[in-house]
């Protein structure tokens, strides 16, 4: 296995820069860079880092050596902590590149080596990637659970139950003259039924994990000039949309990303929806607004309190569902006791974006809907499409399983199910099935 290195911290100006080296020559490289031989594992040393050919000082650094297998990758690993200077990083990288039999690591190669050395399964590796990319508290919680084996436990439970079924059935395939006892048939059928139900329910999750990973799309829609762009600017805490009294100012979709209650929200301000527009560009903007709302996870439908009754149309109300927040804006311009017919149909929030009246209620409602759609629960979620794809394949094989038909074909359906789950976790091993058989049956006795 080659020795690899990379700067693990971001390149650029910072307090500290961290370099990682992994592979059989790691300790030798550290000794070459420092001129010191007596490094003990897991102890941090303050050392000068030099260019071996010239003895030029690169930096005074903290270094540590991890002896295999007690390291992140399971190999010999060295970490070098220098000052976070671009010049230092360039000098150290060039120095490492000039050392024989060491190369720059490929993207994700340290984690890949950790997986290959059985430090964790593929779901945990994906959890580490999600943890690095997490931008909100809820994304972090989901990623931490996955990185610490939350999904592995669930998938391995199903896999072990299926291996048990295979071991039972394989024994009777090898000894066809013996009838399968009724108790074993019942155990197999009950286990099969339970796994089918569990995977079916697990897949029927409304893609909560993927929503949390990728962000919940929130579309702000409504008639023209109701304050949609002002609301977007308020939520984003900066002016990213042009605000004007002229109807139709917003033509295209304006997008922003924010964190509300720990949930990642992708905000979209859209063109005002009205039926009487003759402007071709505005008509295209209205079309895009409606399409945006149809694909949104959360919708805010916004009306102007002064023009509410005359601005309601079916294009707008037809988009309202259980994940919609209906807002009556500019309440500072009407009498406090004025009521609207739409309030009899929907729960409405009365606000004034301009004068910051009741805007916290909007944030709370967004958070409540986001929690309902993607809130973290005790059961780990499916977090990406790869898992969902193989679980659907696994379920298909389980549904095909039938002990009333050929026993070999039935066993193959279970074996294919195990393979699909193994493709998720990265564990596919025929020896496990053999071990299960020999553990439970006294073959040849």
UniProtKB/Swiss-Prot annotation:
Per UniProt, Mg(2+) binds at 229, 250
> Which residue ranges run through the membrane?
none
Q: Where does K(+) bind?
A: 225, 244, 246, 249
Residues holding GTP: 225-230, 244-250, 269-272
Q: Where does the record place the TrmE-type G domain?
A: 215-371
Q: Which GO terms describe its biological process?
A: tRNA methylation; tRNA wobble uridine modification
Q: Which residues bind (6S)-5-formyl-5,6,7,8-tetrahydrofolate?
A: 20, 79, 119, 445
The protein's Enzyme Commission number: 3.6.-.-
**Required co-factors:** K(+)
Stored PROSITE patterns: G_TRME
Q: One of this protein's Pfam families, by short name?
A: MMR_HSR1
Q: Which GO terms describe its cellular component?
A: cytoplasm
Keywords (alphabetical) are: Cytoplasm, GTP-binding, Hydrolase, Magnesium, Metal-binding, Nucleotide-binding, Potassium, tRNA processing
How is the co-factor bound, per the entry? Binds 1 potassium ion per subunit.
Q: Name one GO molecular function term.
A: GTPase activity
Top-level taxonomic group? Bacteria
The record's subcellular locations are: Cytoplasm
List the InterPro entries hit by this protein, alphabetically.
G_TrmE, GTP-bd, GTP-bd_TrmE_N, GTPase_MnmE, MnmE_dom2, MnmE_helical, P-loop_NTPase, Small_GTP-bd
Q: How does it assemble?
A: Homodimer. Heterotetramer of two MnmE and two MnmG subunits.
Q: What does this protein do?
A: Exhibits a very high intrinsic GTPase hydrolysis rate. Involved in the addition of a carboxymethylaminomethyl (cmnm) group at the wobble position (U34) of certain tRNAs, forming tRNA-cmnm(5)s(2)U34.
NCBIfam families found in the cross-reference section? mnmE_trmE_thdF (TIGR00450), PRK05291.1-3 (NF003661), small_GTP (TIGR00231)
Homology family: Belongs to the TRAFAC class TrmE-Era-EngA-EngB-Septin-like GTPase superfamily. TrmE GTPase family.
Q: What is this protein called?
A: tRNA modification GTPase MnmE
The record lists the organism as Rickettsia prowazekii (strain Madrid E)
């Amino acid at each position: 296995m080659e020795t690899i290195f990379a700067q693990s911290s971001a390149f650029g100006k910072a307090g500290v820069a961290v370099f990682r080296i992994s592979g059989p020559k790691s300790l030798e490289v550290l000794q070459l860079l420092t001129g010191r031989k007596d490094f003990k594992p897991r102890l941090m040393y303050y050392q000068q880092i030099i260019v071996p050919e010239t003895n030029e000082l690169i930096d005074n650094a903290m270094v540590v050596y991890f002896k295999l297998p007690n390291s992140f990758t399971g190999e010999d690993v060295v970490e070098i902590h220098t000052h976070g200077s671009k010049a230092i990083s360039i000098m150290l990288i060039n120095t490492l590149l000039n050392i024989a039999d060491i190369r720059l690591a490929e993207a994700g190669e340290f984690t890949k080596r950790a997986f290959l050395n059985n430090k964790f399964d593929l779901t945990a590796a994906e959890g580490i990637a999600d943890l690095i990319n997490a931008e909100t508290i809820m994304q972090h919680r989901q990623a931490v659970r996955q990185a610490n084996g939350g999904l592995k436990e669930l998938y391995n439970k199903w896999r072990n139950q299926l291996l048990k079924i295979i071991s039972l059935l394989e024994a009777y395939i090898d000894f066809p003259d013996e009838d399968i006892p009724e108790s074993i048939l019942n155990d197999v059928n009950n286990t099969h039924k339970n796994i089918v139900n569990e995977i079916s329910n697990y897949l029927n999750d409304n893609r909560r994990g993927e929503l949390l990973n990728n962000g919940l799309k929130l579309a702000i829609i409504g008639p023209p000039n109701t304050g949609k762009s002002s609301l977007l600017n308020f939520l984003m805490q900066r002016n990213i949309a042009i605000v004007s009294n002229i109807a139709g100012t917003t033509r295209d979709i304006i997008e922003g990303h924010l964190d509300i209650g720990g949930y990642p929200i992708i905000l979209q301000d859209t063109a005002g929806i009205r039926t009487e527009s003759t402007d071709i560009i505005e008509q295209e903007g209205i079309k895009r607004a409606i399409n945006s709302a149809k694909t949104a996870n959360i919708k805010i439908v916004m009306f102007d309190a002064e023009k509410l009754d005359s601005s309601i149309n079916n294009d707008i109300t037809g988009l309202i569902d259980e994940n919609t927040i209906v807002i009556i804006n500019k309440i500072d311009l009407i009498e406090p006791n004025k009521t609207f017919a739409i309030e009899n149909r929907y729960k409405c929030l009365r606000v004034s974006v301009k004068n910051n009246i009741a805007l916290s209620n909007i944030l709370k409602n967004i958070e409540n809907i986001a929690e309902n759609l993607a809130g973290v629960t005790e059961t780990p979620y499916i977090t990406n499409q790869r898992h969902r794809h193989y679980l659907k394949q696994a379920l298909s094989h389980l549904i095909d399983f039938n002990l009333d038909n050929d026993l070999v074909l039935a066993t193959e359906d279970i074996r294919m199910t195990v393979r699909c789950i193994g493709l998720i976790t990265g564990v596919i091993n025929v020896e496990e099935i053999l071990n299960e058989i020999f553990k439970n049956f006294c073959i040849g006795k």
